[in-house]
């Protein structure tokens, strides 16, 4: 099974936005693992489909869907596409894993995946991520110095 995490560029209110809908690719559809979707969704404290509309125009998992279909063709495993919002609305000064509701959800989700692995299922976590967008092209008026690059890299690695 594949858990695909992508950036939710529109940053909906939900920290993670799941969808049970398949992703269409030129190589065929990426099917959702419905029992796993239900197990993951049941561990969240909110409706994970509340912001499902974010999947419609989001590009952060499109390449991953095509890549998975290309690699495995007819044997492509089912997946769970999850868009990840900004966590700053929950806390601007703490790591997301230290926010109580997020910490509990991460532990619960980890337990669901561990249970699947204990049943002999292979688990792949695939990230479609963006790193820092800095510079004039992104509206910044600052000079990109080696010191700033090191700081940005450090922030990207958190």
For each of these PLM feature ranges, what is it?
Residues 1-158:
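Active-site histidine-anchored catalytic micro-motif
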């Amino acid at each position: 099974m594949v858990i695909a995490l992508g950036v939710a560029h529109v940053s909906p209110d939900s920290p993670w936005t799941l969808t049970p809908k398949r992703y269409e690719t030129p190589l065929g559809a990426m099917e959702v693992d419905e029992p796993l979707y239900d197990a993951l969704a049941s561990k969240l404290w909110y409706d994970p489909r509340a912001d499902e509309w974010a999947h419609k125009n989001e590009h952060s998992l499109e390449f991953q869907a095509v890549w998975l279909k290309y690699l495995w063709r007819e044997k492509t495993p089912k997946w769970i596409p999850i868009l990840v919002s900004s966590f700053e609305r929950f806390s601007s000064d703490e790591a997301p894993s230290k926010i109580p509701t997020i910490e509990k959800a991460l532990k619960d989700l980890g337990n669901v995946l561990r249970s699947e692995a204990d049943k002999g299922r292979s688990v792949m976590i695939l990230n479609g991520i963006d790193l820092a967008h800095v510079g004039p092209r992104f509206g910044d008026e600052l000079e990109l110095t080696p010191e700033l690059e090191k700081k940005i890299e450090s922030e990207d690695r958190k």
